[in-house]
Regions:
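Short, flexible helix-loop junctions that flank or precede catalytic/ligand sites
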Residues: 1-274
């Protein structure tokens, strides 16, 4: 879905999540994929975290009056193909970003919301008209970072009670189908036979985690979701529709990574409920 959306030449891709959830890293990864000699890319950032070859990067300086909105206004006049805005923080930046997406640019940016569906009311709060929102936003990625297990871990299996408890938070059938489809578990596997892992305390007393990895939910803006936005639907209605169209929630993506031995159920639950 993400690669498909990146190959659109206009519209907007949003990454959402709290501070420190890796949104900027995701934006830089997208820029890296798109950064070919024939494409003109410009960014407005606060701060510039990485210098990227061939990309025209502008640092926001509010103390001299250079805000995201000012930077974006200047960039669009240079007619780049792709614009990255570090964050949409206010109504003016939202309006300019939407306008850039409407006038033949691919716009990448971030928002502070807890879920992919939450990006819709956030933009509406910033006075973006629903018809403009549905004509520009192509994709929303919500994300969090979870700690990764180190090599010191032990395998275990869920009890029936554990599976029932998990079923209150995720769609068990859909998540299991994704595990089978990606060949993490063989076809015909039941939840009782899906391996999970927990950290073993190492001899030096370290906790068994090292590094972090993203867990994601990726919501494409389908025609059904467009209709819901135009009708003023709630975040939960939009989320429900996206899930019915096959979106794995962040929690489901986290459980998917648990079954791969990358992280633990406890870690995913802790991060998602924060």
């Amino acid at each position: 879905k993400v690669h498909k959306a990146l190959h659109q030449t206009t519209g907007m891709l949003l990454t959402t999540g709290p501070t420190g959830s890796g949104k900027t890293t995701t934006l830089y990864t997208m820029i890296d994929i798109l950064n070919t000699p024939e494409v003109n890319i410009s960014t407005v950032e606060d701060p510039i975290e990485y210098q990227i070859a061939r990309v025209n990067q502008t640092q926001v300086k509010p103390e001299i009056g250079l805000t995201f909105a000012d930077g974006l206004r200047t960039l669009v006049r240079q007619d780049p193909d792709i614009v990255m805005v570090g964050e949409i923080r206010d109504n003016e930046t939202a309006s300019l970003a939407i306008n850039a997406a409407l006038t033949g640019h691919l716009v990448l940016s971030t928002l502070h919301t807890n879920s992919a569906a939450g990006a819709v009311p956030r933009l509406l709060d910033m006075k973006v008209e629903p018809f403009l929102l549905v004509s520009t936003v192509n994709l929303v990625i919500a994300q969090r970072l979870v700690r990764k297990l180190s090599g010191i871990k032990e395998k275990y299996f869920l009890t029936k009670a554990g599976i029932a408890a998990l079923g209150k938070s995720i769609d068990l059938n859909k998540t299991l189908a994704a595990l089978v489809e990606n060949k993490i578990v063989p076809k015909g596997t039941h939840w009782e036979k899906v391996p999970f892992y927990k950290p073993r305390t190492a001899s030096d007393g370290t906790e068994g985690y090292e590094g972090r990895i993203g867990i994601y939910e990726v919501m494409g803006i389908s025609s059904a979701i467009r209709d819901l936005v135009m009708r003023g639907a709630t975040t939960s209605d939009i989320d429900k529709q996206a899930r019915s169209e096959g979106m794995l929630t962040m929690l489901e993506d986290g459980i998917f990574k648990c079954a791969q031995g990358i992280t633990t159920i406890e870690e995913v639950m802790r991060v998602v409920s924060e």
